[in-house]
Amino acid sequence: MSPSNVFIDSSVMVGLFIGDEKAHKLLSKLINDGFMLCINPIVFSETMFKVTFHIALEDGIRGVYDLKKNLNRYSWVYEEVREKIDKMIKMNYLKILDTNWEVLKLAPEIGKKYNLLTNDAIIIATCKYYRINKLATFDSDFEKVDFIEIIKE
């Protein structure tokens, strides 16, 4: 992949969907600077769940179990997130990278070396596999990875 790719963590994607100005400014800057935004299925899944959970908490849902019992009230979030991601793809701002077996084989080693949880290790493994050295994130856990440049603003 070219150096113009930047991987976008779910912390930034969630911010975009819940109206966080910092996330919006960061993504706008990256697009204006000519970067192609990249995510994987892990980030898609985390974004979908965290946006749904955030909205449910604002409505008074008390936790994951309560959300699960009332999930039908939030099914609209699935479509809204999917539509916005689809629009970003069609505008050629975003691409979804495959999480293949080669990526998954890298993840345990990366998780152990950098003390990362599973999803974060898969994200970093995706970056390594696709030779992406920039990660837009608000998550400080990634700062310990020595081959990734963290972009926060």
Swiss-Prot record:
Electron transport as UniProt keyword: no
Organism: Methanocaldococcus jannaschii (strain ATCC 43067 / DSM 2661 / JAL-1 / JCM 10045 / NBRC 100440)
Keyword Hydrolase on entry: yes
Cofactor(s) the record lists: Mg(2+)
A Pfam family matched in the record: PIN
Listed SUPFAM superfamilies: PIN domain-like
Binding positions (Mg(2+)): 9, 120
Residue ranges constituting the PINc domain according to the UniProt record: 6-152
Phylogenetic classification of the source organism: Archaea, Methanobacteriati, Methanobacteriota, Methanomada group, Methanococci
Keywords of this entry: Hydrolase, Magnesium, Metal-binding, Nuclease, Plasmid, Toxin-antitoxin system
Coiled coil: none
Similarity annotation: Belongs to the PINc/VapC protein family.
Name of the protein described by the UniProt record: Ribonuclease VapC6
Functional description taken from the UniProt entry: Toxic component of a type II toxin-antitoxin (TA) system. An RNase.
Sample GO molecular function, one term: magnesium ion binding
EC numbers: 3.1.-.-
